[in-house]
From Swiss-Prot:
This is Heat-inducible transcription repressor HrcA. It comes from the Bacteria. It holds the Pfam family HrcA_DNA-bdg. The lineage of its organism: Bacteria, Pseudomonadati, Pseudomonadota, Betaproteobacteria, Burkholderiales. Keywords: Repressor, Stress response, Transcription, Transcription regulation. The gene is hrcA. Belongs to the HrcA family. Negative regulator of class I heat shock genes (grpE-dnaK-dnaJ and groELS operons). Prevents heat-shock induction of these operons. InterPro entries: GAF-like_dom_sf, HrcA, HrcA_C, WH-like_DNA-bd_sf, WH_DNA-bd_sf, WHTH_HrcA_DNA-bd, WHTH_transcript_rep_HrcA_IDD. PANTHER family: HEAT-INDUCIBLE TRANSCRIPTION REPRESSOR HRCA. GO terms for biological process: negative regulation of DNA-templated transcription.
C-alpha cells in the first residue's frame, strides 16, 4: 500500500473516531489536494484490502477491525500523557497494595471514561506475621499480615475457650517457626513442629493454617471500575444484545481473565481489537493493556475496556503511565 493510501486511511479513521459518522470522498477531499474521484478510487482499493467497508445505510466508509489494527500498529502517533504528580500521588496510595490496585482501576476509568480493569497479583500464600485475638467463648480472630503489608482477618471456631496468654503463646510459636513461609509449606511440616505443643493448642494452629490457605485463595482476581460508564458509549449502548454481551463479560470474567493473563506475558502496551483478536469476544470492543510489576518483576496486568471507536492516541499513554505508577506504588511498599 502506497503512502497516499496510508494517509487516506489514517485520515478516514481519525475522522470516524472523532464524530462516529461514515466518511465519504467529499469529506476527505477537503483534507487532501485530490479530486473526489481519485479519493473514491483509493477508498475502493482500501475496501478491497478489507480495511474499510460501507454500512448499508450510507455511501461513506467506516474502518473494519483489520483497518483499526493497521491504524494502531503503523499509522498512529502516540504522545506522552501529562499528569500532575501531586494529584497522582493522592490517587495511587502506597500504604496498602490492595488500595493501590483499586485506585489504579478507578484512575483508568476516570481518565478515559471507559471501564478500568486490573488483574491482581497472584497470591503466594506467604505470611509475615499472624496474631490470635479472643473474641468470645470459642471464637478467635485470626489476623494475617502479608509481606506486602496487606492485612486479612478470619474468624475461627475453637473447640474450647482460650485465654489471652494461650493465644499469645500460639501466635509467637507460629511467627518464630513459620514466618516467611506459605501456609501450604506450614501444613506439610506441621505434624513434627506441633509435637512440642499441647494437643488443644495444636488444633488451634491447624485451624489457623486452613483458614490462612483459604484466605490466600479468596478475593477477586480482577478488579473492575467504571463499567457503567460504557452505558454512555453509543456504539455499545445503542444495541441491547451488545450490552448483554458486555456485562456478561464483566460478570463471568473468564474471557477477561484469559486476555489479561496472556497480556501479562507480553512486553509493554498491548492492543486487542474486537473482530481482530480472538481474545476479545465482541467486535465493537477494544482492550488496551500493560503489565505492572515490583522491582522489575511482572506480577499483574491492567487495562481499559472501551469501544473500538476510541481515541487510541489518548488512551494508550494513559494505560502505559498508570501501569508505571502502580509499579512504582507497589515497589515503594516493599
Amino acid at each position: 500500500m502506497d503512502d497516499r493510501a496510508r494517509a487516506l486511511l489514517k485520515a478516514l479513521i481519525e475522522r470516524y473516531i472523532a464524530d462516529g459518522q461514515p466518511v465519504g470522498s467529499r469529506t476527505l477531499s477537503k483534507v487532501f489536494d485530490l479530486s473526489p474521484a481519485t479519493i473514491r478510487n483509493v477508498m475502493a482499493d482500501l475496501e478491497e484490502l478489507g480495511l474499510i467497508h460501507s454500512p448499508h445505510t450510507s455511501a461513506g466508509r467506516v474502518p473494519t477491525p483489520r483497518g483499526y489494527r493497521m491504524f494502531v500498529d503503523s499509522l498512529l502517533a502516540v504522545r506522552a500523557y501529562q499528569f500532575e504528580p501531586a494529584h497522582i500521588g493522592e490517587l495511587l496510595p502506597v500504604s496498602e497494595p490492595s488500595r493501590a490496585v483499586n485506585a489504579a482501576a478507578a484512575l483508568l476509568s476516570n481518565l478515559t471514561q471507559f471501564a478500568g480493569v486490573v488483574l491482581t497479583p497472584k497470591r503466594t500464600q506467604i505470611f509475615r506475621q499472624i496474631e490470635f485475638i479472643r473474641l468470645s467463648d470459642k471464637r478467635v480472630l485470626l489476623i494475617i499480615v502479608t509481606p506486602e503489608g496487606d492485612v486479612q482477618n478470619r474468624i475461627l471456631s475453637a473447640q474450647r475457650d482460650y485465654t489471652e496468654a494461650e493465644l499469645l503463646e500460639a501466635g509467637n510459636f507460629f511467627n518464630v517457626h513459620f514466618s516467611g513461609k506459605s501456609f501450604d509449606a506450614v501444613r506439610r511440616t506441621l505434624s513434627t513442629e506441633l509435637a512440642q505443643l499441647r494437643d488443644d493448642i495444636s488444633r488451634l494452629m491447624q485451624a489457623a493454617v486452613e483458614a490462612g490457605a483459604e484466605a490466600a485463595d479468596d478475593g477477586e482476581a480482577v478488579v473492575i471500575s467504571g463499567e457503567r460508564k460504557l452505558l454512555d458509549v453509543t456504539d455499545i449502548a445503542s444495541d441491547m444484545d451488545r450490552l448483554r454481551k458486555m456485562f456478561s463479560l464483566f460478570e463471568k470474567k473468564t474471557d477477561l481473565l484469559q486476555l489479561l493473563d496472556v497480556s501479562s506475558r507480553a512486553q509493554g502496551v498491548q492492543i486487542y481489537i474486537g473482530g481482530d483478536s480472538q481474545l476479545v469476544p465482541m467486535e465493537e470492543v477494544s482492550v488496551i493493556t500493560a503489565p505492572y510489576g515490583v522491582d522489575g518483576k511482572v506480577i499483574g496486568t491492567l487495562g481499559v475496556i472501551g469501544p473500538t471507536r476510541m481515541a487510541y492516541e489518548r488512551v494508550i499513554p494513559i494505560v502505559d503511565i498508570t501501569a508505571r505508577l502502580l509499579s512504582n506504588a507497589l515497589s515503594h511498599n516493599q
